[in-house]
Amino acid sequence: WFADERCVAPEDEESNYRLAAEALLDRAPIDAACVHRMRGELGPEQGALSYAGELAGHVQGGGDAGVPVLDVIVLGIGPDGHVASLFPGAQTLSAGAGAICLGVEDSPKPPPQRITLSLAVLRAARACILLATGPSKADAVAGMLGEPTPHVPASLLLRERLTAIVDDAAAPAGPLR
């Protein structure tokens, strides 16, 4: 399962699926039936509807939001504190509690059209691993550890289920909580 995708063809250089395929999926003995890519080529709305249906059909729902509950989700964090394609202050952060997958029309990072899992799905995961490397992520990691705010979407993840793996350059100064 993927957390987000750019609305491009799967073979496009901007495709998260292509990146994952080249770095991992094509190199490991993974059954293709176990890989569920977001269909960015369908566009934001149709791609989100398609993926929401596929995810809901394969993964049991639960929790307060009634959304599919993934065992583990692995996310990166952007320099602005975004996770998946949930950007600071974006409307997608306030999607209804039962939302599974959302179309994004106006990403501040190119390309502007994307598909993303909702915050409800990210928060419902049994465990979340967040990766951050490099000095450009230090402010975002520090913001993630502060008070929850839609200005730093990563701060909205459930901390009791979150494991952050950061290198020295991305680690904020002082003790971590």
Regions found by a protein language model. Name each.
Residues W1-D71:
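Ligand-binding beta-strand-loop-alpha-helix segment within the catalytic cores
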Residues R6, I77-H82, P135-S136, A170:
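Short glycine-rich anion-binding loops that position phosphate/pyrophosphate groups of nucleotides
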Residues N16-E22, P88-A97, G146:
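A glycine- and small-aliphatic-rich helix-loop capping segment at beta-alpha/alpha-beta transitions
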Residues A28-P29, D64-P68, L75, P79, ...:
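Solvent-exposed alpha-helices and their adjacent loops that cap or buttress functional pockets
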Residues C34-H36, D71-I73, A99-I100, A127-L130, ...:
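Structural motif
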Residues A48-L49, A84-G89, A140-M144, L176:
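A short secondary-structure junction signal
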Residues V72-A120:
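Class I SAM-dependent methyltransferase SAM-binding "motif I" and its flanking Rossmann-like core
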Residues A120, A124-R177:
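ATP/nucleoside-binding phosphotransfer catalytic cores, i.e., glycine-rich phosphate-binding loops
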